[in-house]
């Protein structure tokens, strides 16, 4: 059985993915729709809302953090990888109550479910770099 937070992360990835594809969507309506479609699952709705809005409110800062930790060879992320990295980066910087191991593991599991064949290895590598370089991140801007 999946934890309520795992389900919240899965649904957050779906909302962030939709938002990335069409920035015109109304976030509140999309969140409501995703929750309604998944009401049979146990879900931490408050956490779901916090992570979705937290990522979107801080999107430019989060993207800078990700970009600093990605190899120049990988110049373009697919939408799923990007959504997973954005969510996990937000948790690394903002959710100090969650151990880094949990954040990395959740990112890897989401990549295995939704990403391409080797996405989970890529996600693991980038999240590890972000955590390693976390002390160089100016949190006051976040």
From Swiss-Prot:
Family indicated by similarity: Belongs to the NusB family.
A GO term, aspect molecular function: RNA binding
A GO BP entry: transcription antitermination
Keyword RNA-binding attributed: yes
UniProt xrefs under SUPFAM superfamilies: NusB-like
Cellular-component GO terms for this entry: cytosol
Leader sequence residues: none
Native species: Buchnera aphidicola subsp. Cinara cedri (strain Cc)
Name the UniProt record assigns to this protein: Transcription antitermination protein NusB
Functional description taken from the UniProt entry: Involved in transcription antitermination. Required for transcription of ribosomal RNA (rRNA) genes. Binds specifically to the boxA antiterminator sequence of the ribosomal RNA (rrn) operons.
Keywords: RNA-binding, Transcription, Transcription antitermination, Transcription regulation
PANTHER family in the cross-refs: ANTITERMINATION NUSB DOMAIN-CONTAINING PROTEIN (PTHR11078:SF3), N UTILIZATION SUBSTANCE PROTEIN B-RELATED (PTHR11078)
């Amino acid at each position: 059985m999946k934890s309520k937070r795992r389900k919240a992360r899965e649904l957050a990835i779906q909302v962030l993915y939709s938002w990335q594809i069409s920035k015109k969507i109304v976030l509140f309506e999309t969140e409501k729709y995703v929750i309604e479609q998944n009401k049979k699952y146990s879900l931490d709705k408050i956490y779901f809302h916090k992570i979705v809005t937290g990522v979107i409110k801080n999107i430019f800062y989060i993207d800078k953090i990700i970009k600093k930790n990605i190899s120049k060879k990988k110049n373009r992320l697919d939408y799923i990888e990007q959504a997973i990295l954005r969510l996990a980066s937000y948790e690394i910087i903002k959710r100090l109550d969650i151990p880094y191991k949990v954040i990395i593991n959740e990112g890897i599991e989401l990549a295995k479910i939704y990403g391409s064949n080797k996405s989970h290895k890529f996600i693991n590598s980038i999240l590890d770099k972000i955590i390693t370089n976390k002390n160089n991140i100016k949190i006051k801007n976040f």
